[in-house]
Amino acid sequence: MVLIKRHFLQKAAIKVMVDEYLAKQFYNAEYAGVEIVKTPIGTRVIIYAGRPPLIIGKGGKTIKQLAQVLEKFFGLENPQITVTAAENPELNARVMAFRLAIALEKGYHFRRAAFITIRRIMSSGAVGAEVIVSGKLTSERAKYEKLKEGTVYKSGQQLEKIIDRAIGIAMLKPGVYGVEVVITKPTRSIDKIELKEKVEKTEQGGMVTVTNVSFIEENKSSGGVSNASGS
């Protein structure tokens, strides 16, 4: 049992290290995440990014170099790398954090860049979005500014399911700017309720209005949405 636990911990640690390495190397390619799957002939590595060509490189040169690094330094056996476009990049916090960092490095004003980031996220259907930019923004003294739109949950059971959070770093002449992007995904949260009214007859022949409250909950078995109703 101890050996099994150690095996899974090592796999998780390797994935975290690979993820951090790829995020550092390919943030300009809007790196979004990685999947590592062990196969009978080696290791399948699927990289998601907003701009896949920057990771692939000319003639696949960058991919070949990356495969050597993953095998030599991270112990991945015969890595087969696939680079694919991130699905809904505007709803991926890591992609948007890297985009914001790149915009700041190009000279965009932090407030304008953060506002554009918020608008793009909300235009893609997000329930809420929050952007925090910190550093020497307007003076020699470090501070931060926060922009928020919609609903952004800070705690609760559903936090890991509907909240995506990421950070990025922009290197500027005044110093290092830190950016944080938080996105509430376009899914129903467990605190949503629906009120349904219906008219029923009483024993005396009168009419009464009954309100049913439906709590919208996540169906864990099917991954869908189910209603648990009570009066």
UniProtKB/Swiss-Prot annotation:
InterPro entries cross-referenced by the UniProt entry: KH_dom (IPR004087), KH_dom-like_a/b (IPR015946), KH_dom_type_2 (IPR004044), KH_sf_prok-type (IPR009019), Ribosomal_S3_C_sf (IPR036419), Ribosomal_uS3_arc (IPR027488), Ribosomal_uS3_C (IPR001351), Ribosomal_uS3_CS (IPR018280)
Sorted UniProt keywords: Ribonucleoprotein, Ribosomal protein, RNA-binding, rRNA-binding
Signal peptide (UniProt feature, chain positions): none
BP GO annotations: translation
Start and end residues of each KH type-2 domain: 18-97
Pfam families in the record: KH_2, Ribosomal_S3_C
Cellular component annotations (GO), alphabetically ordered: cytosolic small ribosomal subunit
Molecular-function annotations in GO: rRNA binding; structural constituent of ribosome
SUPFAM superfamilies: Prokaryotic type KH domain (KH-domain type II), Ribosomal protein S3 C-terminal domain
Family: Belongs to the universal ribosomal protein uS3 family.
Oligomer status and interactors: Part of the 30S ribosomal subunit.
Function: Binds the lower part of the 30S subunit head.
PANTHER family linked: 30S/40S RIBOSOMAL PROTEIN S3, SMALL RIBOSOMAL SUBUNIT PROTEIN US3
HAMAP family: Ribosomal_uS3_A
Protein name: Small ribosomal subunit protein uS3
Organism this protein belongs to: Sulfolobus acidocaldarius (strain ATCC 33909 / DSM 639 / JCM 8929 / NBRC 15157 / NCIMB 11770)
